[in-house]
């Protein structure tokens, strides 16, 4: 396993829709292991393949019990997952505003409104179809990472003015990281 470099915004890879994974090969499994190592090193909750420069529909996340929230019966709010070719099949009408951050937009966090509950279909590393009902931070993390796979940065959910300010700050931070 090895730590991968994280793509920092602005970068066109972060605004490009990722392509579906056709075969779950040993190379894909190695990528996922490296992504977990990278995410833990960076102290993130989730990481999409596009954030390490791989334009494939894969993301990982590990939402620990301290982030748990009470949700409806049958909904998970914590857990460690690898989701391949994920697709949200249901979103709750109930929305909640919480502060989010992103490993690709360091040194920033913003309040984002998202649905509180969801259902997602995906494949795991064993190429098995899975369905998950998620709530709380787990649901939020799924939406955030799936946005990455669709070429959408979380700051796109802000007003134009706040988005422009966030990207201006991101440009300054990126220059600092590149030195």
Curated annotation (Swiss-Prot):
Q: Which UniProt keywords apply?
A: Hydrolase, Iron, Metal-binding, Protein biosynthesis
The keyword Hydrolase is assigned to this record: yes
Q: Which residues bind Fe cation?
A: 102, 144, 148
Which reaction is catalysed here? N-terminal N-formyl-L-methionyl-[peptide] + H2O = N-terminal L-methionyl-[peptide] + formate
What molecular function terms (GO) are annotated for this protein? metal ion binding; peptide deformylase activity
Cite the EC number.
3.5.1.88
Q: Where is the active site?
A: 145
Question: What is the free-text note on the cofactor?
Answer: Binds 1 Fe(2+) ion.
**Cofactors (names):** Fe(2+)
Please give the InterPro entries that the UniProt record associates with this protein. Answer: Peptide_deformylase, Peptide_deformylase_sf
Q: Which SUPFAM superfamilies match?
A: Peptide deformylase
Share an example GO biological-process annotation for this protein.
Answer: translation
Q: Keyword Hydrolase: yes or no? A: yes
| UniProt cross-references to NCBIfam families, sorted A to Z | pept_deformyl (TIGR00079), PRK00150.1-3 (NF001159)
Task performed by this protein: Removes the formyl group from the N-terminal Met of newly synthesized proteins. Requires at least a dipeptide for an efficient rate of reaction. N-terminal L-methionine is a prerequisite for activity but the enzyme has broad specificity at other positions.
Protein family per UniProt: Belongs to the polypeptide deformylase family.
The protein depicted here goes by the name Peptide deformylase
| Species whose genome carries this gene | Wolbachia pipientis subsp. Culex pipiens (strain wPip)
